[in-house]
Amino acid sequence: PLAVQVLAIVLVADFTQYWVHRTFHAVPFLWPFHAIHHSVEDMDWLAGSRLHLVDVILTRGLTYVPIFVLGFSQSALMAYVFLVAAQATFIHANVRWEFRPIRRIVATPAFHHWHHSAETDATMSRDA
């Protein structure tokens, strides 16, 4: 079923993207490429689109390879692309909603804003 495929894509992509993102924060050579994304001073819905080309190629490339190798349907892929675009827009939006019931399993705007902040804990961990 389509819903199962979309859920599987979300899980595979989220796992992969999490580790790619952590790598951008942890590897000094890669950080300058990702730092472009963190250079936004006032978060708004377009902040998620502020990316260096190297960041885009590595993140999307490494995230999409397992999705394509696993052979999901075109409909499931299209649904995933829509969901991930909406989610990126939402977490970068100029709101600080916490969504307490789900904030431990889903990145919320409040958490992602903290991740982009200048606080030492946020800038040193950069886990979002």
Regions found by a protein language model. Give the residues of each.
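Membrane-embedded catalytic scaffold of the fatty acid hydroxylase/desaturase
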Residues: L2-A128
